[in-house]
C-alpha cells in the first residue's frame, strides 16, 4: 500500500477538502476511505465551480474523480513520516522547504 493511501486512511474521522475533476470542492468529515480512494463523507459543504455553495448530509465519491485532497495539518506528525530504523533519510516530499 502506498504512502498516499496510508495517509488517506489516517484522515478517516477528520475534516478534509477534496477537489474533483469537474472543479467542485467538497469539505466535510471523511467517514471511510477505500484503497482505490473511493471516499464516504458526512456533513459536506459543496462549492461548485461557479461559486454556489450547498450542503449535503452524506456523499460517496469515486476515487478516480478526485483531483486532489487537503488533509489536516496535524497529520504532518503521523508516525509514517518519522525516520525509522533502517531508514536514514525522511521520505521525499514535493515542494519547497
From Swiss-Prot:
GO cellular component: catalytic step 2 spliceosome; commitment complex; cytosol; nucleus; post-mRNA release spliceosomal complex; precatalytic spliceosome; SMN-Sm protein complex; spliceosomal complex
CDD domains with a match to the protein in the record: Sm_D3
Domain Sm intervals: 3-75
Primary localization class, coarse: nucleus
GO MF entry, a single one: RNA binding
Record keywords, A-Z: Cytoplasm, mRNA processing, mRNA splicing, Nucleus, Ribonucleoprotein, Spliceosome
InterPro entries hit by this protein: LSm4/Sm_D1/D3 (IPR027141), LSM_dom_sf (IPR010920), Sm (IPR047575), Sm_dom_euk/arc (IPR001163), SmD3 (IPR034099)
Chain coiled-coil ranges: none
Domain of life: Eukaryota
Subcellular location: Nucleus; Cytoplasm, Cytosol
Family under the similarity heading: Belongs to the snRNP core protein family.
PANTHER family: SMALL NUCLEAR RIBONUCLEOPROTEIN SM
Function according to Swiss-Prot or TrEMBL: Plays a role in pre-mRNA splicing as a core component of the spliceosomal U1, U2, U4 and U5 small nuclear ribonucleoproteins (snRNPs), the building blocks of the spliceosome.
Protein name according to UniProt: Small nuclear ribonucleoprotein Sm D3
Organism the protein comes from: Schizosaccharomyces pombe (strain 972 / ATCC 24843)
Gene name for this UniProt entry: smd3
Amino acid at each position: 500500500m502506498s504512502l498516499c493511501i496510508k495517509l488517506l486512511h489516517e484522515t478517516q474521522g477528520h475534516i478534509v477538502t477534496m477537489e474533483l475533476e469537474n472543479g467542485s470542492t467538497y469539505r466535510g468529515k471523511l467517514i471511510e476511505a477505500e484503497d482505490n480512494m473511493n471516499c464516504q463523507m458526512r456533513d459536506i459543504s459543496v462549492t461548485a465551480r461557479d461559486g454556489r455553495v450547498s450542503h449535503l448530509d452524506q456523499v460517496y465519491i469515486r476515487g478516480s474523480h478526485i483531483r486532489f485532497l487537503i488533509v489536516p495539518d496535524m497529520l504532518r506528525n503521523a508516525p509514517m513520516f518519522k525516520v525509522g530504523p533502517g531508514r536514514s533519510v525522511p521520505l521525499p516530499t514535493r515542494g519547497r522547504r
